[in-house]
Amino acid sequence: MEVNNRVVVGMSGGVDSSVTAYLLKEQGFEVIGVTMRVWVDPYGKARDDDKSCCSLKAIHDAKKVAEILGIPHYTVNLSEVFYDKIVKYFIDEYLKGRTPNPCVFCNRFIKFGDLLEKAHELGAYYIATGHYVRKEYDEDRKRYLLKKGLDFKKDQSYMLYRLTQEQLKHALFPLGNYTKEEVRALAEKIGLPVADKRESQEICFIPDNDYKAFIKRQIKKDVKPGEFRDIHGNFLGYHKGIINYTIGQRKGLGLSSDRPLYVVDIDPENNVVIVGHQEDVWGEELISSNNNFISIEKLEEEIKVTAKIRYTAKEDEAIIKPYGDDKVLVRFLRPQRAITPGQSVVFYDGDVVVGGGIIEKKVR
């Protein structure tokens, strides 16, 4: 497709995507709003309040903003593909004793994958979202770079580390140079009804943030209980099913001990949850798989980066190097708490996203 000034904005009904659409229209783009309804709860548990990005209220808000801005708006039902690509993955990971982050895959396959397809159907070269990140093209590397948003408190680059060069080529991020406060102020100034709308904090398809109940409803059976063992293999008691536990967890174990106990590992093959003390939760090395690189095509040698092992974690210095078959060995210079299989580890060079992968296991 030839470059043109038509852009499809993924509109969630929130303030960020609404201001994104406004800014692009002000810049002279031909803006089309598209809201993707990715989740319709068959059990009727899904929230329909203003916090849920999948609710009817969210669709109504997006349409209202589009009317105010004078742009066309479409709603696309992607619930089936979302279930196949994201929800099944989420459930399978928990049943394997891992703690997934479905949002990173939703961004890759739905918000930037399916949205880009829809954009091309509508004759648009570009897609845009309300993420707080920046993009630039590096002439020397001949690659598009993903950079942190200037508002480091709202930076969402961790969630977008799986984007491809093709997706970045077509992506626009107007909010990358704004703070959240500036975005809300602008929305209020231009009279958008979502200026003070609360942000959605939970996973969009998990009612009341109760993922355990969600999984049980989806698999239509109870999870199998198993054994608690300590790091030396000693039997300590019985657990209620591995989906109820994550690395670093202390509450809800139901075990008595003279010192606090924490989940330090999960053995899904034997249905065993391994517990230890606070010092056993920390680690310095991990292996990541299913890696995706942005600033480089492939990791071919050892490099020094900063990295973080979950969205809310602080970055810390680390060395990454190729390991076996397309895996990466990550060695932190300082111990990290609760290295959790299934979560993403993301690598940075300053404010540039190098890449990242899914944590496979803690090495030590």
UniProtKB/Swiss-Prot annotation:
Localization in the cell: Cytoplasm
Gene Ontology BP annotations: tRNA wobble position uridine thiolation
Enzyme Commission numbers on file: 2.8.1.13
A single GO cellular-component term on record: cytoplasm
InterPro entries linked: MnmA-like, MnmA-like_C, MnmA-like_central, MnmA-like_central_sf, Rossmann-like_a/b/a_fold
Active site per UniProt: 106 (nucleophile), 204 (cysteine persulfide intermediate)
Function according to Swiss-Prot or TrEMBL: Catalyzes the 2-thiolation of uridine at the wobble position (U34) of tRNA, leading to the formation of s(2)U34.
Protein name, entry field: tRNA-specific 2-thiouridylase MnmA 1
Organism field: Caldanaerobacter subterraneus subsp. tengcongensis (strain DSM 15242 / JCM 11007 / NBRC 100824 / MB4) (Thermoanaerobacter tengcongensis)
